[in-house]
């Protein structure tokens, strides 16, 4: 018979020497686990002795407990009658009645973000909105598209306009894909599976985050037969963990490729995320708040780090490898997976060129500065596209080039395609859509971008994606901003 514990008894175990938590009505002894927790020691200690379900559930996929805790860590269940009652915050009748407006009344992605900002928790907002340092790269990602002008042609029948294209040979309904974006359940319980449901109706590709809040099996469970997914890979210091996950996703037929992320070997300094590090913690048992100065070492003598938690983003990077190299990493990856490989996070023409030399092992690249979340003042994807066109245009013939960052209008989509991108990715907009209205919010996001992209192509005088090219844009202003030094290609070849 399962042991039933009083919440007051659980609350006593709030130290590194004896650390218990309540999850889904069950009591776990996590004392042995806290020193190896990927997100750091203090994340658990802040919740020690309390019901941590509300904090735990949105950011951990099913199976996490079973994978990391021994069976004997389960001590029993908690008597629900003994749990402290959370404080009820007073709210006005207007606030209680207020909810998201009908999604069809939102006409652009900015309006969707505004609605989502009011709906999601402060913690979710901090994680989604945040970017590195002064947000220069994040903002420039978007602003750069405004400096590119369109060159429409006339006397062309545009009654039929086809937005379909291919990514790695797979037919997709839109040249717009969902970039890997973590922790979708912070926005809405539907999570990444909700994004997948929205993509299904548009035939859009979804790249699943390595740090998704749902399991890959859950996310692709209701996929259409021809629906296309990719799996993002952050290589772990313990390579066996990455190999195990790759073996797992290879069993899912809907996942067509691996996206190896390279632009964030360490997390950037995301201050908005850091500020929310202690926000939203439901800690009704005051004794569970362990003072940092009181927690100096773990039972095994390991010092507890004294730096701040760093927010959700920093916690997710725990265990991520920072020792990747072209030869060793790609040799390893091609041995452990049969899935096509896309390299994500390239920010210079030199790296794009080197990647093309690894074809056919490397099938594609994503030009990205991680949404401005890694190195602030790193270039936007548009700059790198123009660099490739200037220094090594043969890259476009050898591998597929995708981009992400700053896409908020259909005109942005078209401009990127004109510069040679195969498709463009959206990350935050999908999360904001989910936060604004669940699946319907993501559908509305894709609908707006699809409609705007179609309208832009028709007004340009273009019937299909493959007809787009540099003759439809004027990028002279942006070209003045890009790197103008030596090509560096010979030096790049010498390193191979």
UniProtKB/Swiss-Prot annotation:
Keyword Flavoprotein applies: yes
Cofactor note: Binds 1 heme b (iron(II)-protoporphyrin IX) group non-covalently per subunit.
Assigned keywords, A-Z: Flavoprotein, FMN, Heme, Iron, Metal-binding, Mitochondrion, Oxidoreductase
Pfam families: Cyt-b5, FMN_dh
Subcellular location: Mitochondrion intermembrane space
GO MF annotations, alphabetized: (S)-2-hydroxy-acid oxidase activity; heme binding; L-lactate dehydrogenase (cytochrome) activity; metal ion binding
Quaternary context: Homotetramer.
Protein name: L-lactate dehydrogenase (cytochrome)
Organism: Talaromyces stipitatus (strain ATCC 10500 / CBS 375.48 / QM 6759 / NRRL 1006)
